[in-house]
Amino acid sequence: MYKKQRIRTHPRSGISSDYLCLVCHKKGIYLGNNAISKNLIMVNRSELLNGNSFITGVSGSGKSMLAKQDIVNLYLSDKNADIIVIDPEREYKIVEALGGERIILSATSKHHINAMDMNRDYGDGENPLILKSEFILSLCEQLIGRLDLKQKSVIDRCTKIAYRGYLMNGCEGEVPTLKDLRKVLLEQPEVEAQEIALAIELFVDGSLDTFAKPTNVDTKNRFICYDIHDLGKQMMPIGMLVVLDSILNRITSNRAKGRSTYVFLDEIYLLFKHEYSADFLFTLWKRVRKYGAFITGITQNIEDMLQSHTARTMLANSELVVMLNQAATDREKLAELMGISELQLSYITNAEAGHGLVKIGGALVPFVNHLPKDTELYRLMSTKAFE
């Protein structure tokens, strides 16, 4: 809930001459303290119209620390919530500390995620194969370029054939892989089928076949970290798509069980560098609310990210945006996008780590968040070399 609290305010607050918003949602998670009133800021994303969020700030501003603190608070306070992280820099030591599963993805990794994994709840109440076929088409386009109608028809037909036994068994048992799909393609009479099979060979039966094998990691752990640090340029575009689809599988499965899912996408701008992962993320971003899921994007590259219309729309429509210390050009972009005044911008100008401005619904609140350095939790969260 939001309350208007009459207090004496400093003139640089920029919030109101004599009122501040007191943010204290029922079952809220600690975000920090109001920089003016010192009141706790407790946020429950399910209370917002759109529970997705962003954490932004320059390197060293404290965004990683804030995200990890949010993860720990969610993990410990809500036993009915699962956490998923995409980690490009291998910075989330808290995964192992909390008994989570780190899935290391690369061309040489022993960990594998099957690109064709599909649970019975994948289809949003409809035939799951319809939605999965769309994903397979996007995956193939990412691998070989734009597809014409003949190619799309062939892939759709072969996808149905590959999944036939799995669907007849009620989505139980052995899930087909891209190797099975390619085998079906090679059995088709059309020239297009043979061309597609050849085009995807490198990623199915060649050196980069890590997503064409059965999943061999625990994707049901309460805390999953997709470690993409070693994924490489060749595999990054397809890897991003497969990881996002794996996350969708978990979200839809959790919805059927009545569980919440919190997804943290570190360096989210990486997803916007590739058309198909950006489109998939945008669709996921719009849909997850009804699935009981919430996505947080973390980035220091606001100006670059906002060159994507998709990213701009997502940021503008987010009800929770945490802004830490910002570069000058990023401050200008944020002010334009969110209507932030010069006075309010002072809270994200040369700000100390953990200090900033947070947009919560229609409120803009200056905040501070400090975690004592003499704690094991701080040491687990810190990304500083000698801490």
Regions from the PLM with identified roles:
Residues 63:
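Conserved lysine of the Walker
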Residues 299:
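H-loop/switch region of ABC-family ATPase nucleotide-binding domains
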Residues 1-16, 58-59, 305-387:
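C-terminal regions of RecA-like/P-loop NTPase motor modules
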Residues 73-84, 98, 249:
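Post-Walker A helix-loop "phosphate-sensing" segment adjacent to the P-loop in P-loop NTPases
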Residues 1-41, 46, 90-293, 306-309, ...:
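P-loop NTPase motor domains
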Residues 55:
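Hydrophobic anchor at the beta1->P-loop junction of P-loop NTPases
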Residues 50:
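Short coil/loop residues immediately preceding or within conserved phosphate-binding loops
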Residues 66:
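Hydrophobic positions on the alpha1 helix immediately C-terminal to the Walker A/P-loop
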